[in-house]
Amino acid sequence: PETYPDVEDLEDLRDLGVTINIFAGQTYAEIFVAQGVLSADQIDPSYDATPARFIAEQGAIAQQGFASSEPYAYKNVYEEWGKDVAITLLNDNGFPIYSQTIAIKPSMKDEMDACLTELVPIFQQSVVSYHEDPARTNAMIVDINVQYDDGWVYTAGNAEFATAAMAEYGLVGNGPDAIVGNMDTDRIQEMLDAIALAGLEHDESLTPADLVTNEY
């Protein structure tokens, strides 16, 4: 926020010509270019999931990250930075995708019907239970992170921040009614329209009803 105090969204970064550092092959980047939200020449697909470049350039670039993780890490873990970073959500800039969905092959739906009938409510209850009391699960996540030792830094403080951030930014919550885990078909259609606008390869005959169901 100190580097670009007037920036609130991706269009502001576009207008300033700020480099956007992301992983290669990101669908949202192609969609944002098609929508005019970003310019193709400002996207740098060389992000390596480390803070090194952002810190070396003193925050002159923007980069992808998790709203539930990076703000904490940059302020509390990466001592070379040690201050706030500003964020804007993909969803708020025109990419309302559902993240981390549970998917099956349509051809297997009948075969898996009995299992899904039992399993999906467990998923739903786990979301509710976690956000009512996340301490035990957070401790397990932190422990597993240490055991994997794969380069990702995730502390107890980060886990606590993540829980609060998910609620603050609406990263988790009910669907269009009072049920957690169900999907808004209008939102699915918005994504299909965005994919078509960007000219991405897809089956043009698909409708939201072909892709999601709320029956479980």
Where are these regions (language model features)?
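Pocket-lining segment of extracytoplasmic ligand-binding domains
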Residues: 29, 47-149
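Flexible hinge/capping segments at coil-to-helix
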Residues: 2-18, 110-113
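A short alpha->loop->secondary-structure connector
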Residues: 36-44
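Secondary-structure end/capping motifs
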Residues: 111-198
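Long, low-complexity C-terminal extensions of enzymes
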Residues: 191-192, 196-216
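Short loop->beta-strand "edge-of-pocket" segments that line small-molecule binding or catalytic clefts
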Residues: 10-25, 61-62, 121, 125-127
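Conserved PLP-enzyme active-site core in the AAT-like
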Residues: 32
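Active-site catalytic pocket residues across diverse enzymes, especially alpha/beta-hydrolases
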Residues: 35-36, 78
